Swiss-Prot record:
UniProt topology in membrane: Peripheral membrane protein
Name used for this protein in its record: Photosystem I reaction center subunit II
Organism per entry: Trieres chinensis (Marine centric diatom)
InterPro entries xrefs: PsaD (IPR003685), PsaD_sf (IPR036579)
Keywords: Chloroplast, Membrane, Photosynthesis, Photosystem I, Plastid, Thylakoid
Cellular component, GO annotation: chloroplast thylakoid membrane; photosystem I reaction center
One GO term of the biological process aspect: photosynthesis
Entry's localization field: Plastid, Chloroplast thylakoid membrane
Signal peptide per UniProt: none
Keyword Thylakoid set for record: yes
Family stated for the protein in its record: Belongs to the PsaD family.
Gene3D superfamilies linked: Photosystem I PsaD, reaction center subunit II
Role: PsaD can form complexes with ferredoxin and ferredoxin-oxidoreductase in photosystem I (PS I) reaction center.
Pfam family for this entry, one: PsaD
Length: 139
C-alpha cells in the first residue's frame, strides 16, 4: 500500500488547534478517501471542511481522530477510506483496515474471537450452574 502525498486536502478554513505541532517530532496519521461529489463534513478537531470531488488526504494527530472521521464518512456512504501512520523519518505504515476488510465484516480467513457456536437462546440457565464451580461464560 502506498500513500500518494500529492493528493489534495479538503478545503478547511480553520486550524487544528495545534494538534499537528507534536507530529513534527513524533508521528502523524493520514486518512485518504474518495468522494463522488464535494460535500461538507465535520472535522474531528472541530469545525467543518469541504471534501473534494475525487481523492482526499487529511493529516490528523491521533488515530482515534481518523477512526472518528472514518465513522462519519460511512454515513456519506464512503467506505474506501484508509488510515496510515507517518513517522518523522518519512516511513509510512498502513493501519486500517489491516487486511482490507473492516473489522465488523466477515472475511473468509478471519478467525472469530470470543464467539460461541450457538445462539443466545441455547445458553444454560445461570441458576442451574450457580454453585457448580463453573462460571457462566465457560459453560
Amino acid at each position: 500500500m502506498t500513500l500518494n502525498l500529492q493528493t489534495p486536502f479538503p478545503t478547511f478554513g480553520g486550524s487544528t488547534g495545534g494538534w499537528l505541532r507534536a507530529a513534527e517530532v513524533e508521528e502523524k496519521y493520514a486518512i485518504t478517501w474518495t468522494s463522488k461529489k464535494e460535500q461538507i463534513f465535520e472535522m474531528p478537531t472541530g469545525g467543518a471542511a469541504i471534501m473534494r470531488n475525487g481523492e482526499n488526504l487529511l493529516y490528523l494527530a491521533r488515530k482515534e481522530q481518523c477512526l472518528a472521521l472514518g465513522t462519519q464518512l460511512r454515513t456519506f456512504k464512503i467506505n474506501d477510506y484508509k488510515i496510515y501512520r507517518i513517522f518523522p523519518s518519512g516511513e509510512v505504515q498502513y493501519l486500517h483496515p489491516k487486511d482490507g476488510v473492516f473489522p465488523e465484516k466477515v472475511n473468509p480467513g478471519r478467525t472469530s474471537v470470543n464467539s460461541r457456536g450457538f445462539s443466545i437462546g441455547k445458553n444454560p440457565n445461570p441458576a442451574s450452574i450457580k454453585f457448580s464451580g463453573i462460571t457462566t461464560y465457560e459453560s
